[in-house]
Amino acid sequence: GEDCHVIANTAWRNPPEFAGGPWHCDAGPHVPRPKGVEWDDRIPYPVFAIGAHLLLRDCRRPDGPTAVVPGSHRSGRLAPLSQIEDPDLTYDGRAPVLLEGSAGDVALFVSDVWHRGTTATGGSGRCFLQVHYGRRDIAQRIRPTDVANQLSPDAIERAITTRQRDLVGLHDPYFYDG
């Protein structure tokens, strides 16, 4: 929507021998709840931040793609500590889904969904840019300075419209921006 901006960005390159990572959330849970307290489906679930993986090369099962557990963002909890290494972790009976794709594809997921990099099994590894977009009231993880905004001069020059400048963080700080 119009009320979001880039809150973080990173580049990832996992080698072909990547052993996989634990289940985790990049942010959240944003609406924490104890086990057994489910979300009331009559209320739209709020999205505070999303992650985007911009694939720089094809990413298939042998490359160790990101896996997500569908619906886990609605749990209000982190993945159970006793299962963070379990590749078959489920939530509400739903098994993990691999975010496979071709170079140039973008995989989007809610930042508080349980996800992990899977074990590479003979491919070339993962290679992607990761961008997190958050609601405007969520502070950017990379803070601008007087000298640099973590953007190249060319990128700053291309941000022409107010919306483009807001999206990449070229805006006056709000309360939570520090």
Predicted regions, residues:
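Residue-level marker of positions within ordered structural domains that often coincide
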Residues: 1, 57, 109, 134-136
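Short, surface-exposed loop/helix-turn segments at secondary-structure junctions
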Residues: 25-37, 81-95, 125, 144-149
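Non-heme Fe(II)/2-oxoglutarate
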Residues: 79-86, 106, 113-178
